[in-house]
């Protein structure tokens, strides 16, 4: 379990909207405890994400 950017099948990082609701829902549906949308880059950042769902620098 880790905190980090969520990795999705169709994108290597999940883009989100400023309010973060979509990000929180996606993180929880993928096993995370919470999620928010970063202001820089509008990318979804998750807390408590399973290792296989988290983006790693070697992921694409």
Curated annotation (Swiss-Prot):
Q: What is known of its domains?
A: Has the structural arrangement of an alpha-helix connected to antiparallel beta-sheets by disulfide bonds (CS-alpha/beta).
Specify the protein name.
Putative insect toxin Acra6
Record's subcellular location? Secreted
Gene3D superfamilies the UniProt entry points to:
Knottin, scorpion toxin-like
What does the entry state regarding organ or tissue expression? Expressed by the venom gland.
Keywords assigned: Disulfide bond, Ion channel impairing toxin, Neurotoxin, Secreted, Toxin, Voltage-gated sodium channel impairing toxin
What superkingdom does the record give? Eukaryota
Keyword Disulfide bond included in the entry's annotation: yes
Q: Which residues form the LCN-type CS-alpha/beta domain?
A: 2-60
Q: Could you tell me which cysteines form disulfide bridges?
A: 16-37, 23-44, 27-46
Keyword Disulfide bond on this protein? Answer: yes
Matching entries from CDD domains are given as: neurotoxins_LC_scorpion
Similarity-based family: Belongs to the long (4 C-C) scorpion toxin superfamily. Sodium channel inhibitor family. Beta subfamily.
Q: Which GO terms describe its cellular component?
A: extracellular region
Query: Biological process (GO) annotations?
Result: defense response
Query: Listed GO molecular functions?
Result: sodium channel inhibitor activity; toxin activity
Pfam families attached here?
A: Toxin_3 (PF00537)
């Amino acid at each position: 379990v880790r905190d980090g950017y969520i990795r999705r099948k169709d994108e290597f990082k999940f883009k989100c909207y400023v309010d973060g609701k979509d990000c929180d829902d996606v993180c929880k549906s993928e096993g995370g405890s919470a999620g928010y949308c970063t202001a820089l880059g509008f990318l979804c950042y998750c807390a408590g994400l399973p290792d296989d769902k988290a983006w790693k620098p070697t992921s694409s």
